[in-house]
């Protein structure tokens, strides 16, 4: 059995020589960035939490990408995940009265041929929430169904976002319910045509 302290030390040692740790999932990046320091408080400094970031955050804030060579001639609806919005700052949360921004949309706007929409209640949870979906499967599924319907109401062919867990949750529900919409990670769109 590996303790959390031992686990973190493995991660710290593995990534100590890197400037950044880039994660393809906002919820995973948020866990290491926000929760590792709290879990490990008083045991040792969590070096990984200072280096990790979501791929959208890395492309937008560090690399400052200003051109994407790919093409994606489809209509998409952007899924703003809870962790991405509220813990990583990938977009402005609706409950705060600040100037609206969305790093996901900033990047997608560089893709040739794409049409971008956001659903009504754009930053409301899809119902996954990790253990929540296991402990409250009926509520989780209903929240996912409602979120998918709002994405579909935009006329989108695809739902996209930076959080793999949200996309997998909604894709599973859509498949089971035979809902005519597809799911694709934002990086797949940014890399389309490469």
Role assignments for model-derived ranges:
Residues 1-6, 11:
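Single conserved hydrophobic/aromatic residue that forms the stacking wall/gate
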Residues 46-67, 177-194:
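Short, flexible loop segments at boundaries between secondary-structure elements
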Residues 139-155:
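A short, acidic, amphipathic alpha-helical segment used as a generic capping/interface helix at domain edges
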Residues 24-51:
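Glycine/small-residue-rich loop that forms an oxyanion/phosphate-binding "nest" at active or ligand-binding sites
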Residues 88-114:
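Anionic-ligand binding region
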Residues 23-31, 79-90, 121-136, 157-172:
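Local cysteine-cluster metal-coordination motifs and their immediate loop/turn environment
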């Amino acid at each position: 059995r590996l303790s959390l302290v031992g686990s973190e030390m493995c991660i710290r040692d593995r990534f100590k020589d890197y400037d950044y740790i880039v994660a393809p999932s906002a919820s995973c990046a948020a866990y290491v960035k926000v929760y590792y320091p709290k879990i490990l408080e008083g045991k040792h400094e969590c070096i990984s939490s200072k280096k990790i970031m979501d791929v959208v955050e890395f492309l937008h804030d560090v690399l400052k990408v200003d051109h994407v060579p790919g093409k994606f001639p489809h209509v998409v609806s952007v899924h703003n995940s809870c962790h991405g919005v509220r813990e990583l700052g990938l977009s402005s949360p609706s409950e705060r009265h600040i100037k609206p921004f969305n790093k996901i949309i900033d990047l997608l706007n560089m893709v040739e041929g794409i049409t971008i929409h956001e659903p009504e209640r754009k930053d409301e949870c899809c119902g996954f929430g990790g253990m929540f979906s296991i402990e409250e499967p009926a509520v989780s599924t209903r929240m996912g169904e409602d979120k998918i319907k709002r994405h579909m109401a935009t006329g989108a062919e695809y739902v996209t976002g930076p959080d793999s867990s949200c996309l997998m949750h909604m894709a599973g529900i859509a498949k089971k319910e035979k809902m005519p919409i597809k799911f694709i990670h934002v990086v797949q769109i940014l890399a389309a045509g490469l």
